[in-house]
Amino acid sequence: MPPTNGEGGSQQPQQQQQQQQQQQQQQQQQQQQQQGGSGSSDFVRKLYKMLEDPSYHSVVRWSDDGDSFVVLENEKFTKTILPKHFKHSNFASFVRQLNKYDFHKVRHNDENGESPYGRDAWEFKHPEFRADRKDNLDNIRRKAPAPRKQQQSEEAFNASQQQIAALSESLQATQQQLQALQQQCYELEKTNRLLVSEVMTLQKMVKAQNQASNEIINHLGSMEDRRRNNRGATQAAPNFHAGAMSFLTDGAEEPAPELRRARELLSVVGPDLQANRELERLYMTYNQNGAPAEPAATNSSAVMFTQAAAPGTQATAPGMPLVHNPLNDPQNMMYPVAQTPSIDPSFHTDQMHNMPYSRPLSNPAVVAETSSSQITPSQITPPPKDQMSSMWRDKKPRVLLVEDDKTCARIGAKFLSTLDCGVDTAGDGLEAVERINQDSTRFDLIFMDIIMPNMDGVSATAMIRMVSPHVPIIAMTSNIRGEDINTYFQYGMNDVLAKPFTRDNMSRLLRRHLAHLLKDPQSAASTGIVLTTDDLTLAGQTAGPATTGVGVGVAGAPSGGAHGPGPPAQHQQGYAMAPPTTMQPAPPQVKFEQSPTAAPAPGLDPSSAAAAPTWQSTNPAGVQLQPPPPPTPTQPSPTSAAPPAGLDPASAVAAAAAAAAAAAAAAASMTPGGYLAAAPPPPPPPGAMVLTPAGTPTGVGHPAPSGAGSAAGARGPPGPGPVGPGSVVDDSRPEKRQRLMQGGYASVSGHGHGHPGVGVAGFVQ
């Protein structure tokens, strides 16, 4: 039976619903295909349909194997087929679309490299795109974007954020540093202004005081003239001649010495015109440019110079207000910063940790203020170096620094250079003697070390005194005991510079001994004594009585005997006339292994010679040193008996020297330090010159009387010259003994007997 109208009416809505559902499903499939869903792409289906059309086989078709398609004629394909099936207007965009769906161009690796379909043919292939597998079209989908790119973009974004943070921190640190520098510049500028103002005020005060002093001196001079005129007018006529003579001898024609000296002092202490002009220029510059505003006084440095200003004087100059101005706040004077700072492409994240940052200011609110007109560096220039004040006059002193230690010599030369002195250096005493022999008047002062190779400082001083008796020689040593200083002064040294020394100590000695070269000679009077009685061990406290050998000084050098220093010829004559059996007080037991001594003058009793105040018992600095105690008389040795009658003194000296040398050779033994004491060679005739192991010419010592010695084995100290009999290496100072032995010197113990004083050339402190 046909359906009724009611039934037909109910079936129509159901069909419409089914059609709508089918349409929705088709739309969803299309959306899925466009979005890379489970359905195949419309582009792939169009491509497959185009290849199925036999009318296009001459332009585009499947390959022989059916696993790829070939575009035979590129131009026809672009003009006729692409516009009909695709929305591409050129072949390049079509190839890019194929690449998006993972189609790849087939490249032929034959010998000729040409496609079998022609030279202009383009062949494309996909693993799922085949002529006999239409059902595989759903597997061909558009390639999704790689997730790595998104991750890289996120990392780049994070890196850019870190760079921005690092740059902002660096900018903040730079701003804080700039604020700190502005604060310091402000304080320096304000301090400089105050100092210039104070100096100008002090100059005005000094000028006023000089004027007042001149007025007082003129007034006193006029009063002195009136007094003298009144005294001359009241003299009686009978006594005119005598009064006139006394008037002339009393100095009526000349002013009082006090007034004359005051005028000289005022004339010497004159202002430096160039410095005054520079100060005036700065003062005028500051007044014209104005002063910077003063920040809140939160620390003591802001008011330091204001509190130090003298009462009754103006602390600041006119035109220099110290009022806070908010418009000059350094925070408002910063360099402008962009809102979005640019990032350097070459900036990497590993560089952020290498950026220097300064610590933030503890109180960044306290900032400086700068003046509206800044003073450029060209406006304020320091004075030239050659215009700096020197303490010397036209001639600068020339100093010879004798020191074997390179470090000490470098420091001393630097100090002397800063004191505006010309410096020459010598490495040992022998080199210093050669310098003096070349030009004895070249040097104004000599700093002499004591312990040196080749020739020690005392021997070098004794030889220099033969050529230059007046040049000041200052010993540089750490031994500043009284007995040591007596030895230095005895052989011609003028002063002692204790090691380690300073620039002030060296300057004080230069002012003392070169006062005639100073601009202001009166400044030398203010120099104090370098050595005090607390620093000195007075002579004779550690010296024991002993008989001594009398030796001639090094190369006939003068030595301090009872007569003190004198010309070398006088000393040599005194030595020649001294009898070999003359007793002499023992010199102080100094730190040298050999202590040079000298014979007393003829006819002078040894005890009186020891008690007589000589130049060796008083140093040039004025420190009184105790002379050595008188010796204990001992029984003379047969080897030192008086010469027989009729024998000249020279022959007696030679005979006694030979006898003493033989006795010393027989008494050669082990020293207290364990070194074998070598027997001395026969001494040459008196007055001859011999060479030490280092090649230093020295004088030959006279024979000395031999004594019984004390219970402790007192030994007679030798005379100056190379190490010889009668010398003992002090066992308590092994480092000095080792240095002496390394220099080639031998050590022979006296064992209680006085031996010929051949002398010492290598004194050891």
UniProtKB/Swiss-Prot annotation:
GO biological process assignments: phosphorelay signal transduction system
Post-translational modification 4-aspartylphosphate, affected residues: 449
Record region (Hydrophobic repeat HR-A/B): 160-220
Biased composition (Pro residues): 626-636
CDD domains, sorted: REC_hyHK_CKI1_RcsC-like (cd17546)
Region called Transactivation domain, residue ranges: 542-765
Single Gene Ontology MF annotation: sequence-specific DNA binding
Similarity comment: Belongs to the SKN7 family.
Function, in words: Transcription factor that is part of a SLN1-YPD1-SKN7 two-component regulatory system, which controls gene expression in response to changes in the osmolarity of the extracellular environment. Under low osmotic conditions, phosphorylated and activated by the phosphorelay intermediate protein YPD1. Also activated in response to oxidative stress, independent on the two-component regulatory system. Regulates heat shock genes in response to oxidative stress and genes involved in cell wall integrity in response to osmotic changes.
Domain notes: Homotrimerization occurs through formation of a three-stranded coiled-coil structure generated by intermolecular interactions between HR-A/B regions allowing DNA-binding activity.
Protein name in UniProt: Transcription factor SKN7
Source organism (scientific name): Chaetomium thermophilum (strain DSM 1495 / CBS 144.50 / IMI 039719) (Thermochaetoides thermophila)
Gene (UniProt): SKN7
